[in-house]
Regions:
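Beta-propeller folds
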Residues: 1-396, 401-404, 711-721
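Serine-hydrolase catalytic core recognition
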Residues: 407-721
Length: 721
């Protein structure tokens, strides 16, 4: 019996189960460590090793939580928060850390600490008290550090000699954990770092007492006590974050910098070529400074004073780029700079990548060169590149029409590539002995995309058009569904087959589905990204309308512009609701999932980057709010929101619904009890797609026959109301 796409997508967690991920390459290139479940519908992550030192390279599983009798059904609250911030929906082993040689790995399952032998194989539980969060072996593999109850502890790699290194008795003062803003907006999911010599740790101390408390409850279970969380909404105080260096001997020193001027601790790097290095930002994010901490003063004392080694400013904002800063073995600093409308790699301030090559992330740095990812002529594609430290020998290592990521270095490089015309991903290890595949056990999607990459309108907007699988030339006109994200820091119009599967499923129900990336999206240069400064509404919405109009002009008779809907989640949900409120002449219906309706309710780091402080820019916040447009609603609007969402809290949807009710505007609200900003539950994920389809059919007055019957796979206009 065949399984429908909505059910298959839900069971496979959007086809991520069974795919290898989270790669770590041993310093000597002898092995690659990674996570993978045992099948495309198996949600339990296992730890695997590809042994490249064997006569015949082979992979083997070194830790399966089921064999270890590990139970992750009851996660510690801190671990639940970490998984929500990283959008992690799998179970079992979802994260691990290794020593420098990748001989041992540490991980936690259900708060229990395990250590795996990556050479001989096998894993064992350590007899330390829990719950354990974020365990990390020392670089020499002799010890393991971890967080428990907001304190940092260390033990021998066998679990012996457990002792606390840093902590407070106040639950609002935590050590070794990333605060909400760092994890949600800066992609910093950790709060402590081993020194290269394994004798010290740099530990973040987070004081959440200044932060307002919000409460996330479950209205479906009135006996449940709401959970209090420190949520820094725009214009309100952030957590106070500081950094200490703590020795195994108990000695500690605070790293000193001007935290009033540069309060955001965005990243910490502590690797052998360089000093303890911090990346800090001003509150308005127009200044980003790389600091080096002084831990070896002339008189033998550790002052902890930090000096600036690179400072970047911008009148709009300065972006954080993954993988930088880092240090070359000779002490030169690798960073990025925005010059000639290009994000370029720099070495001690000198650009080493050319104009037009938009750097996405640095992967690794050696004296021989730098591995990085970048987009060249097309933001829909990302390739892996290598460049010499002086800018010589620039070389693209993956195809120009793929979406690629990488781990490791030039000697042992893991590449993961996705193609527009091929489901899944291809993972390979490029080693001096040859190229070796890493198996994917992910399920094959039940549908295949019928899509074309487009450039639309005067701005050459990158877009994808998905048509019904059985569409024939001359069929139409088809009802249209716009399916964007459309905002900063994310793309949907990419050269990846699986990124478009849900859009294709809607197309197979009889729609022409258009996915367009407008101004503010990454990959097209700093000016393009910063064109939404001060206004997140006008340009993104105008670009969706322009993409629709240009697509219709390019395909006469294909699109029914009288029946156009739009759907989206998060910023895409905001954009969808915005579309029917401000352009009802274009959009006949909208589905807004987890929409940000009032920018003053969203977090500091994201919102203030684009709109400034609410008390300084009240007009910007008012102009970008959906609440003020409630009386303009004339079209069907479906609002969907998880009531347990702690990122875009349900108050966004509830406040818009209240404003619509007060204005006498009919609308539909679908509350999801127990659901966060993700929708990982199988039944919820499946039925949510089906309910959205029915809403579109009803709102656009479209009848859907069986697939393969009727124009374009079954969508025909109806006169019924």
């Amino acid at each position: 019996m065949s399984v429908s796409f909505p059910r298959q997508s839900a069971r496979t967690q959007r086809f991520t189960l069974g795919a290898p991920r989270s790669f770590r390459v041993a310093d000597d290139g002898s092995r690659v460590v990674y996570l993978r479940t045992r099948g495309g519908e198996d949600p339990v992550g296992c730890l695997w090793v590809l042994d490249l030192a064997a006569a015949e390279p082979r992979e083997h599983c070194v830790a399966d939580p089921r064999d270890l009798r590990a139970d992750d059904s009851q996660l510690p609250p801190e671990e639940r928060a970490r998984r929500e911030r990283s959008r992690e929906s799998a179970g079992g082993i979802v994260a691990f850390a290794t020593d420098d040689g990748a001989t041992v790995a540490a991980f936690a399952v259900g708060g229990q600490l395990f250590v795996a032998d990556l050479v001989a194989g096998g894993a064992r539980a350590l007899a330390v008290s829990g719950p354990v969060i974020d365990p990390r072996p020392s670089p020499d593999g002799e010890r393991v550090a971890f967080v428990r109850d907001g304190a940092v502890l260390v033990a021998g790699i066998d679990g012996s000699g457990e002792r606390r290194l840093a902590g407070d008795d106040d639950p609002e003062l935590t050590w070794g954990l990333a605060e909400f803003i760092a994890a949600e907006e800066m992609d910093r999911l950790r709060g402590y770092w081993w020194s290269p010599d394994s004798r010290q740790l740099a530990v973040a101390r987070v004081d959440t007492r200044p932060v307002q408390r919000w409460h996330i409850g479950d209205p479906a279970d009135p006996s449940t006590v709401p959970t209090a969380m420190a949520y820094p909404a725009a214009g309100t105080p952030n957590a106070d974050v500081s950094l200490f260096v703590v020795g195994l001997d108990g000695h500690s020193v605070e790293v000193a910098w001007d935290r009033s001027a540069l309060p955001y601790l965005a990243e910490v790097v502590w690797s052998a070529p360089g000093p303890l290095t911090l990346v800090v930002q001003s509150r308005n994010q127009r200044e980003r400074v790389v600091l080096a901490a002084n831990l070896d003063s002339a008189d033998g004392t550790d002052t902890g004073a930090a000096r600036a080694v690179n400072r970047v400013t911008d009148e709009r904002w300065v972006d954080l780029v993954p993988g930088v800063p880092c240090w070359l073995p000779d002490g030169q600093l690798v960073d990025t700079a925005d010059e000639q409308d290009t994000r370029q790699l720099t070495v001690d301030g000198r650009p080493i990548t050319p104009a037009g090559l938009q750097v996405r992330a640095a992967v690794s740095v050696t004296s021989e060169g730098i591995i990085f990812t970048a987009s060249q002529d097309d933001p829909a594609a990302i390739a892996v590149w290598r460049v010499g430290v002086g800018g010589e020998e620039l070389q693209r290592l993956t195809a120009p029409d793929e979406v690629a990521a990488a781990a490791g270095d030039a000697d042992t490089l893991v590449t993961v590539t996705r193609r527009f015309d091929q489901p899944g991903a291809v993972t390979e290890v490029r080693h001096r002995l040859g190229t070796f595949p890493v198996r994917s056990l992910a399920a094959t999607p039940a549908i295949t995309t019928r899509a074309q990459l487009l450039r639309l309108g005067q701005r050459r907007l990158r877009a994808v058009l998905c048509l019904p699988s059985d569409h024939r030339e001359g069929d139409g006109p088809l009802p249209v569904l716009l399916d964007p994200y459309g905002g900063p820091h994310a793309q949907r119009a990419v050269a990846s087959h699986d990124a478009l599967l849900t859009s294709q499923w809607f197309a197979d129900q009889g729609f022409a589905v258009l996915v367009a990336d407008g101004r503010g999206t990454p990959g097209r240069g700093p000016a393009w990204e910063r064109s939404v400064a001060g206004d997140l509404a006008t340009a993104p919405l105008a670009d969706q309308v322009d993409a629709l109009t240009a697509c219709a002009d390019a395909h006469p008779g294909l699109l029914n512009l009288e029946r156009v809907a739009i759907r989206g989640w998060s910023f895409g949900g905001y954009l969808a609701a915005l579309a029917v409120l401000r352009r009802p002449d274009v959009f006949a219906a909208a589905i807004a999932g987890a929409p940000v309706t009032d920018m003053a309710l969203y977090d500091t780091h994201y919102t203030e980057r684009y709109l400034g402080m609410p008390d300084e820019q009240p007009q910007a916040y008012a102009a970008n709010s959906l609440l003020n447009d409630a009386a303009s609603l004339r079209r069907p609007l479906l609002l969907i929101h998880g009531l347990a969402d702690d990122n875009v809290v349900a108050a966004h949807t509830l406040r818009l619904s209240r404003a619509l009710l007060e204005a006498g505007r009919p609308h539909t609200v679908l509350p999801l009890s127990g659901v966060t900003h993700m929708t990982p539950q199988e039944e919820v994920a499946e039925n949510l797609l089906l309910l959205q389809l029915r809403f579109l059919q009803d709102s656009l007055r479209v009848d859907i026959t069986a697939p393969g019957q009727g124009a374009g796979g079954g969508a025909v206009a109806s006169n019924r109301m």
